From Swiss-Prot:
It comes from Picrophilus torridus (strain ATCC 700027 / DSM 9790 / JCM 10055 / NBRC 100828 / KAW 2/3). The gene is rpl15e. GO terms for cellular component: cytosolic large ribosomal subunit. GO terms for molecular function: RNA binding; structural constituent of ribosome. This is Large ribosomal subunit protein eL15. Keywords: Ribonucleoprotein, Ribosomal protein.
Amino acid sequence: MLSSYSMIRDSWKKLKKSDIYPVQKARMVSWRKSGSVVRLDYPTRLDRARSLGYKAKQGFIIVRSRVRKGGQHRPKIMGGRRPRRLAYNKLTVKKSIQLIAEERAADKYPNMEVLNSYYVGEDGLYKYYEVILIDRSSPAVLSDKNVSWIANSANKGRVYRGLTSAGYKSRGLGHGRLGSAKSRPSIRANGRLRR
């Protein structure tokens, strides 16, 4: 007998064949009309939120963050140069879209720290992520030995320093020592060490 969390996970793995697909399509319509960062009462994917550390208690909130899809382009340079040196179109950013979503959620709630985030959907224009935020000064968080580490000053602004899971991936880390020797402790610091 599958647990309820397993059933939720399986339905998200095969979304187009599952029963929640019509509901998800309706969600996309309403999500596009809503704001870019919206606080939620409960997570859309309960299994994923719980596996990433979410608890339904005081000090924890869930925020849905919306980020545009695709590459970026910078404003066109009006000074003279060869066309091939313009480089204002088809730019790939070093940050992942998920990390950008986490940073925008952290900007909206400056008194909270980002714990983690997970994917909840996309349409033709946007990708949607739900971000787990923790109030670092909440008594319920400080008394919980599993999450009280986030109240340390070393973890302040962790999303901006690439210390979340999405940040680790963007920095070329997160898959052990093998293959990331030149990315540690960071790409910039490693380059300085090799001079």
